[in-house]
Protein backbone atom coordinates (compact mmCIF):
# COMPACT_ATOMS: atom_id res chain seq x y z
CA UNK A 1 0.00 0.00 0.00
CA UNK A 2 1.38 3.40 -0.96
CA UNK A 3 1.69 6.00 1.81
CA UNK A 4 -1.03 8.67 1.56
CA UNK A 5 1.44 11.36 0.48
CA UNK A 6 2.21 9.39 -2.71
CA UNK A 7 -1.24 8.14 -3.75
CA UNK A 8 -2.12 10.72 -6.39
CA UNK A 9 1.08 10.39 -8.41
CA UNK A 10 1.85 7.18 -10.31
CA UNK A 11 5.23 5.47 -10.44
CA UNK A 12 6.34 4.21 -13.83
CA UNK A 13 7.27 0.80 -12.36
CA UNK A 14 5.94 -0.33 -8.98
CA UNK A 15 6.78 -3.96 -8.27
CA UNK A 16 5.89 -5.39 -4.87
CA UNK A 17 6.54 -8.77 -3.21
CA UNK A 18 7.77 -10.52 -6.35
CA UNK A 19 10.50 -13.13 -6.81
CA UNK A 20 12.83 -13.61 -9.76
CA UNK A 21 12.29 -10.19 -11.37
CA UNK A 22 14.57 -9.04 -14.22
CA UNK A 23 14.48 -5.55 -15.75
CA UNK A 24 16.95 -5.40 -18.63
CA UNK A 25 17.90 -3.26 -21.64
CA UNK A 26 15.09 -0.70 -21.53
CA UNK A 27 14.91 3.09 -21.44
CA UNK A 28 12.58 4.85 -18.99
CA UNK A 29 11.70 8.56 -19.16
CA UNK A 30 9.91 11.12 -17.00
CA UNK A 31 7.65 9.42 -14.49
CA UNK A 32 5.11 11.46 -12.51
CA UNK A 33 6.71 10.19 -9.28
CA UNK A 34 9.56 7.79 -8.51
CA UNK A 35 10.59 6.04 -11.70
CA UNK A 36 10.95 2.56 -10.20
CA UNK A 37 9.87 1.26 -6.80
CA UNK A 38 10.69 -2.32 -5.81
CA UNK A 39 9.16 -3.35 -2.49
CA UNK A 40 9.98 -6.60 -0.62
CA UNK A 41 11.23 -8.35 -3.77
CA UNK A 42 13.70 -11.26 -3.89
CA UNK A 43 16.18 -12.16 -6.64
CA UNK A 44 15.84 -8.81 -8.39
CA UNK A 45 18.11 -8.08 -11.40
CA UNK A 46 18.32 -4.64 -12.99
CA UNK A 47 20.76 -4.57 -15.90
CA UNK A 48 21.60 -2.27 -18.78
CA UNK A 49 18.79 0.24 -18.32
CA UNK A 50 18.80 3.96 -19.10
CA UNK A 51 16.69 6.29 -16.99
CA UNK A 52 15.96 10.00 -17.39
CA UNK A 53 13.59 11.32 -14.71
CA UNK A 54 13.49 15.12 -14.68
CA UNK A 55 9.82 16.05 -15.14
CA UNK A 56 8.65 16.57 -11.56
CA UNK A 57 9.64 16.85 -7.91
CA UNK A 58 10.31 13.53 -6.13
CA UNK A 59 11.61 12.06 -9.36
CA UNK A 60 13.83 9.34 -7.86
CA UNK A 61 15.68 7.11 -10.30
CA UNK A 62 14.92 3.88 -8.39
CA UNK A 63 13.96 2.85 -4.87
CA UNK A 64 14.87 -0.56 -3.47
CA UNK A 65 12.78 -1.12 -0.33
CA UNK A 66 13.06 -4.23 1.84
CA UNK A 67 14.44 -6.29 -1.05
CA UNK A 68 17.01 -9.09 -0.86
CA UNK A 69 19.38 -10.72 -3.32
CA UNK A 70 19.54 -7.75 -5.69
CA UNK A 71 22.00 -7.09 -8.54
CA UNK A 72 22.01 -3.65 -10.18
CA UNK A 73 24.50 -3.27 -13.02
CA UNK A 74 25.17 -1.07 -16.07
CA UNK A 75 22.51 1.50 -15.14
CA UNK A 76 22.85 4.98 -16.64
CA UNK A 77 20.54 7.46 -14.95
CA UNK A 78 19.81 11.15 -14.48
CA UNK A 79 17.17 12.16 -11.93
CA UNK A 80 15.86 15.38 -10.41
CA UNK A 81 15.63 13.79 -6.95
CA UNK A 82 17.64 10.87 -5.53
CA UNK A 83 19.35 8.32 -7.77
CA UNK A 84 19.74 4.71 -6.64
CA UNK A 85 18.01 4.73 -3.27
CA UNK A 86 17.79 2.00 -0.64
CA UNK A 87 14.96 2.07 1.89
CA UNK A 88 13.41 -0.19 4.51
CA UNK A 89 9.97 1.21 5.26
CA UNK A 90 8.81 -1.96 7.04
CA UNK A 91 10.43 -4.49 9.36
CA UNK A 92 12.18 -6.16 6.41
CA UNK A 93 15.84 -5.30 5.91
CA UNK A 94 17.29 -4.51 2.47
CA UNK A 95 20.14 -7.02 2.10
CA UNK A 96 22.51 -8.93 -0.15
CA UNK A 97 22.72 -6.19 -2.76
CA UNK A 98 25.40 -5.56 -5.39
CA UNK A 99 25.61 -2.37 -7.46
CA UNK A 100 28.31 -2.12 -10.14
CA UNK A 101 29.29 -0.34 -13.34
CA UNK A 102 26.66 2.41 -13.08
CA UNK A 103 26.73 6.09 -14.08
CA UNK A 104 24.41 8.17 -11.91
CA UNK A 105 23.51 11.88 -12.05
CA UNK A 106 21.17 13.52 -9.57
CA UNK A 107 20.13 16.94 -8.34
CA UNK A 108 19.99 15.45 -4.82
CA UNK A 109 21.79 12.29 -3.63
CA UNK A 110 23.13 10.04 -6.37
CA UNK A 111 23.46 6.94 -4.16
CA UNK A 112 21.37 7.05 -0.99
CA UNK A 113 20.81 4.68 1.91
CA UNK A 114 17.73 5.99 3.77
CA UNK A 115 16.09 8.02 5.06
CA UNK A 116 13.18 5.62 5.58
CA UNK A 117 15.12 3.05 7.60
CA UNK A 118 12.90 1.02 9.92
CA UNK A 119 14.90 -2.22 9.51
CA UNK A 120 18.03 -0.99 7.73
CA UNK A 121 20.64 -2.39 5.34
CA UNK A 122 23.01 -5.36 5.41
CA UNK A 123 25.56 -6.84 2.99
CA UNK A 124 25.60 -4.16 0.29
CA UNK A 125 28.50 -3.76 -2.16
CA UNK A 126 28.81 -0.78 -4.50
CA UNK A 127 31.76 -0.75 -6.91
CA UNK A 128 33.02 0.66 -10.21
CA UNK A 129 30.47 3.48 -10.44
CA UNK A 130 30.63 7.10 -11.60
CA UNK A 131 28.61 9.86 -9.96
CA UNK A 132 28.48 13.08 -11.95
CA UNK A 133 26.59 16.32 -12.44
CA UNK A 134 23.16 16.16 -14.07
CA UNK A 135 22.76 17.04 -17.73
CA UNK A 136 19.82 19.27 -16.71
CA UNK A 137 21.06 22.57 -15.28
CA UNK A 138 17.79 23.74 -13.68
CA UNK A 139 16.79 21.68 -10.64
CA UNK A 140 13.25 21.29 -9.32
CA UNK A 141 14.66 19.58 -6.21
CA UNK A 142 18.19 19.97 -4.85
CA UNK A 143 20.63 21.84 -7.08
CA UNK A 144 22.05 21.52 -10.58
CA UNK A 145 25.37 19.92 -9.63
CA UNK A 146 23.80 17.59 -7.07
CA UNK A 147 23.75 17.77 -3.29
CA UNK A 148 25.66 14.61 -2.39
CA UNK A 149 27.42 11.74 -4.11
CA UNK A 150 26.82 9.05 -1.45
CA UNK A 151 24.45 9.54 1.51
CA UNK A 152 24.35 7.03 4.37
CA UNK A 153 21.34 7.90 6.53
CA UNK A 154 19.88 5.75 9.31
CA UNK A 155 17.22 7.82 11.09
CA UNK A 156 14.50 5.36 12.15
CA UNK A 157 16.47 2.96 14.36
CA UNK A 158 17.46 0.45 11.66
CA UNK A 159 20.91 -1.06 11.21
CA UNK A 160 23.63 -0.42 8.67
CA UNK A 161 25.93 -3.44 8.54
CA UNK A 162 28.60 -4.69 6.13
CA UNK A 163 28.38 -1.89 3.55
CA UNK A 164 31.34 -1.88 1.11
CA UNK A 165 31.81 1.03 -1.30
CA UNK A 166 34.87 1.02 -3.58
CA UNK A 167 36.27 2.38 -6.83
CA UNK A 168 33.78 5.25 -7.10
CA UNK A 169 34.42 8.44 -9.08
CA UNK A 170 32.46 11.44 -7.77
CA UNK A 171 32.61 14.57 -9.94
CA UNK A 172 30.02 17.29 -9.50
CA UNK A 173 27.97 17.04 -6.29
CA UNK A 174 28.61 19.68 -3.61
CA UNK A 175 29.41 17.02 -0.98
CA UNK A 176 30.99 13.64 -1.83
CA UNK A 177 29.77 11.81 1.33
CA UNK A 178 27.12 12.50 3.93
CA UNK A 179 26.56 10.34 7.02
CA UNK A 180 23.58 10.76 9.36
CA UNK A 181 22.98 8.22 12.11
CA UNK A 182 20.04 8.66 14.47
CA UNK A 183 16.97 7.10 15.94
Predicted regions and their residues:
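Extracellular/periplasmic carbohydrate-active domains that bind, remodel
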Residues: 1-183
Amino acid sequence: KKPDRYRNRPYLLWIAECKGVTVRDIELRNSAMWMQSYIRCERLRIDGIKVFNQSNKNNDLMDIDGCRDVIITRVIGDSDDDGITFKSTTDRISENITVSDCIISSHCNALKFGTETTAGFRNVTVTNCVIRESSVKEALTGNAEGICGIALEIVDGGIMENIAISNIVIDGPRVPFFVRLGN
